[in-house]
Amino acid sequence: MQIFDTHTHLNVEEFAGKEQEELDLAKEMGVVAHNIVGFDKPTIERAMELTGQHPELYLTLGWHPTEAGDYSPEVEAYLLEQLKHPKVVALGEIGLDYHWMTAPKDIQEKVFRRQIQLSKELDLPFVVHTRDALEDTYAIIKSEGVGPRGGIMHSFSGSLEEAKRFMDLGMMISFSGVVTFKKATDVQEAAAGLPLDKILVETDAPYLAPVPKRGRENKTGYTRYVVDFIAGLRGLTTEEVAQATYDNARKVFGLD
């Protein structure tokens, strides 16, 4: 069985010195490929270090909406240089975060739009973070347009109808441990109802640990629980969902 964790943060302080232990556990649970997401300079640099040490790791680099206030021509030049790395598979995570509101909405929108444009110029898919901002996120993606490489709605927390709207724009829908939460019925309906070739799985580790590990530090190996849960929702085997989402990840990341 092969599982691809399409969004994890092995590059943050919580995992410092424990990366090999995390990857060993992941392998035991069938998680054989990992997309490490760098969202500011320290996490970008650590992600690049890790991918140089572990062949099963891939890179997504971008400027997170909570850091949008720091975006500048110098930051963009830095990003463009790092995005030349041969293991880069996407640009992100980018988007809107109205929960923390560390930057005004207009600044977040400007930085989001600019990075969508960059992803198309670089022929990369883009990975979207949206929190308390789903309608504005949709409007911006619709107006900017999705390039031929597509994009990913990371840790999707909306309904089936909302997911279909993003899918119709050319986006893949990625499910994290949120789908396993008891009250996340809308997300569960989306995971059950979308075409299997349009979904991905992730952990967003160390955040959002799935049931039965909810409330603890998340681990990239716990993608297995997300796969198990979605398989149950869809009446499929774990192996079927694992292989389908693995193949979907390789396709969107241009690894085939």
Describe each region flagged by the PLM:
Residues 1-256:
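Mid-domain alpha/beta scaffold segments of enzyme catalytic cores
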